[in-house]
C-alpha cells in the first residue's frame, strides 16, 4: 500500500468516526480524480486527501492548487451526472501532517 493509499484509508476511517458514510474511493476520470466520496446527512461529500510527512515545503493544505480544485469540481459534477444524482454536495479536504488529521469542511 502506498503512502497515498494509507493516507486515504486513515482519512476514510476518521470521517466515518465523525459520522460520514463511505461511498467510493479513487473515482477516476480522464480529467480528474476524487479521493473519497462520502455521505453526510443529506450531503454528498467529495473529499480531497492531502498528506505531508513534514511541512518544510509547505503544508498539506498549500499543496492544493486552483487547477486541482477545478479538476476535482469537474470530476464531482461528472460523478453526480453519471449517477443521476440531484443532491446537495460539498467539497472537504482532509490534511494529514505529522500524524495529525485536519478536516476542513466545505473547503472550496
UniProtKB/Swiss-Prot annotation:
GO terms for molecular function: nucleic acid binding. It holds the Pfam family UPF0102. It comes from the Bacteria. SUPFAM superfamilies: Restriction endonuclease-like. InterPro entries: Restrct_endonuc-II-like, tRNA_endonuc-like_dom_sf, UPF0102_YraN-like. Coiled coil: none annotated. CDD domains: PoNe_Nuclease. NCBIfam families: PRK12497.1-3, YraN family protein. PANTHER family: UPF0102 PROTEIN YRAN. Belongs to the UPF0102 family. This is UPF0102 protein Shewana3_3881.
Amino acid at each position: 500500500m502506498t503512502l497515498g493509499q494509507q493516507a486515504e484509508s486513515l482519512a476514510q476511517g476518521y470521517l466515518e468516526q465523525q459520522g460520514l458514510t463511505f461511498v467510493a474511493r479513487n473515482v477516476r476520470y480522464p480529467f480528474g480524480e476524487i479521493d473519497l466520496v462520502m455521505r453526510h446527512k443529506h450531503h454528498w461529500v467529495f473529499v480531497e486527501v492531502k498528506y505531508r510527512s513534514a511541512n518544510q515545503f509547505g503544508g498539506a493544505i498549500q499543496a492544493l492548487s486552483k487547477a486541482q480544485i477545478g479538476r476535482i469540481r469537474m470530476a464531482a459534477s461528472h460523478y453526480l451526472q453519471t449517477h443521476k444524482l440531484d443532491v446537495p454536495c460539498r467539497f472537504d479536504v482532509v490534511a494529514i501532517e505529522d500524524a495529525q488529521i485536519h478536516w476542513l469542511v466545505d473547503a472550496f
